[in-house]
C-alpha cells in the first residue's frame, strides 16, 4: 500500500481486507470505547473484531477513571469478587459488541465478534469451565460475544463441551500441529453434539489462535544460543512456517467429505487467527507479521500501535500461505536437525501462557478489589 491520499469511503486496511484477512483489535479496554477509538477503527480502518485480555483490563482499571462509577456500584459487600470482575469485563465486551454489531450483521456472524477470557483457575475442571462460560456469556448478553479457552489438555475437553452447548469459543495458546489437530477434533465433536441436540450450527462460530511472536521469540533465542551460520539464517522463520502448516491442515480439514456434511447443516469453519503480532525487533518492520500472514478467511490480531502502522502503510504481495506447505515443513526439518525441539517448545510456551494468564487474572482481581474499596471509602 502506498502513502497516497485515500479516497473517501476507502478503508485504511482495504487491501488487507480484500485478501480475505479480518483485522481485529487486541487489548480492548473501556478507554477504546469511551474515547470513540473503536468506533473510528471500525469506520476508517476496517477493524472487524476485538479481544479483551485481563492484563490490559487490570492496567486500565488501575489507571482509567472510566471505571470509577461502575466500581462504586460494585462496592457492596454483597457482591463477591468473582461477580465484580465478571461485571467489569462484561461491561466492556458488551459495549464493544454493540459497536461491532453492524459488522456482525453484515458478515452474517463471521466477524464483528468480541472475545474475552475466563478465569484460568477453572481450566482444570471441565464442568466448572463450562458453567463459567455460560455465566460470562449471559452477563454480556450479546450474540457476538465469545469466550476464550486455552488449548491445554483440560481446555480441549472444555472446548468440546462449550461448542456442544452452543457457546462461541476462541481457542488460545495453540503452538504445535498436534495441539491444533486436537482443537479441530474438539470443534468437530462439539458441532456434532450441538447438531444432535437440535442447535442451529449457523449460529456457532469459533476461532483458534497461533501466537506467532511468542513462537518466533523462543525459537530465535535458541538459534542465537547455537550461533552457527545455519542457525542464524533461520531466525524469524519458525512462526510463519508453522502458520503455513496450520493453514494446510485447515484447508485439508475443512475441504474434506466429513466437513462438507457439517457445512450442509450450516456449520462454519473454525478460522485461524494470528496473535502476538507486535514486533519488538527494531530492525524489523512493525507490520512484518501482518504482511507475511495473508490468506483468505484468516484473522490478524493487532495492538493499537500495530494497527496504526498497518493503516499507514502495508507492502502487500498477495497470498503468502497457500501452496507453501512444503517449504514450511522444510524450515521445521532444518530446525529439528539443529536440535530445536518443536514439541518441547510448544509445551513450554503453552505452560507459560497459562501461567501468564493466571498472573494477569490475579492482577485483575487485585485491581478491581482496590477500586471497589477506594469507591467504598469515598
Regions found by a protein language model. Give the residues of each.
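N- or domain-start disorder-to-order transition segments that initiate the globular core
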Residues: 1-36
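Active-site-adjacent beta->alpha loops and helix N-cap segments on the catalytic face
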Residues: 32, 125-131, 149-163, 176-187
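Active-site beta->alpha loop and helix N-cap motifs at the rims of alpha/beta catalytic domains
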Residues: 56-59, 63-158
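Flexible, acidic glycine-rich loops studded with aromatic residues
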Residues: 266-376
